[in-house]
A protein has these predicted regions:
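Beta-strand secondary-structure signal
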Residues: 23, 33, 44-46, 60-62, ...
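Beta-strand/loop substructures that line and gate deep hydrophobic ligand-binding cavities in soluble
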Residues: 51-108, 113-115, 119, 124-126
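Short beta-strand segments that buttress and anchor functional surface loops
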Residues: 20-27, 46-52
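Hydrophobic ligand-binding cavity/cleft-lining segments
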Residues: 1-18, 134-135
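Short coil-to-beta-strand transition motifs
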Residues: 27-31, 55-57
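Residue-level recognition of beta-strand termini and adjacent short loop/turns
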Residues: 16-18, 41, 67
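Charge-rich (especially acidic), low-complexity segments
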Residues: 123-135
C-alpha cells in the first residue's frame, strides 16, 4: 500500500511461516491473490498471482546488494498468456500489447518503491501516470 502507485488495498489472507497468501485490490477494482511459493531470506521471493479462480502468472522479486547503501531490485514476470496455446499465435499480441503494458506497470511499481524510500511517505496513487490495466 505504501509504495505501490496502483494498489488501493492489500489484505493478508494467511501469513504463517510456510504459508504466505494475500489479496491486492487495484485502483480500478480488479482483485488478485498472491500465493508466495518461496521465500529466500535477504534475497527475494517467488509468487503466483492472478484472480482467485483464474489463471496465474509467476513472478520473482530479487534484491542484490551493490554497496553498503545501495541495492538493486529486479522483478521477473512470466505472464500466464505466454503458456497458453501456440507461441506463434501468442507472439504478436504479447509483443504489441502485453509486454509494453507490463513494462510500464513494473516501471511504475519500481518508481513507487524508489519514491517511497526517498520521501519517507506513501507514493501518491497513479503518481507516474494511469495504467490501463490497474488505474
Amino acid at each position: 500500500d505504501l509504495y505501490h502507485p496502483f494498489c488501493k488495498k492489500n489484505d493478508i489472507i494467511d501469513w504463517k511461516k510456510d504459508n504466505h497468501h494475500d489479496r491486492l485490490e487495484y485502483l480500478n477494482g480488479v482483485v488478485v491473490e498472491r500465493k508466495f511459493i518461496s521465500w529466500i531470506e535477504d534475497k527475494g521471493y517467488d509468487l503466483n498471482i492472478g484472480t482467485k479462480d483464474g489463471r496465474k502468472s509467476h513472478v520473482s522479486w530479487r534484491i542484490e546488494d551493490i554497496s553498503e547503501n545501495k541495492s538493486a531490485l529486479s522483478i521477473e514476470v512470466h505472464p500466464w498468456i505466454v503458456n497458453q496455446g501456440s507461441r506463434i499465435v501468442q507472439f504478436l499480441p504479447f509483443q504489441l500489447f502485453v509486454k509494453p503494458q507490463l513494462k510500464s506497470y513494473l516501471k511504475s511499481v519500481l518508481g513507487g518503491l524508489k519514491w517511497y524510500a526517498e520521501n519517507n511517505k506513501p507514493t501518491p496513487r497513479n503518481h507516474f501516470g494511469v495504467h490501463r490495466w490497474f488505474s
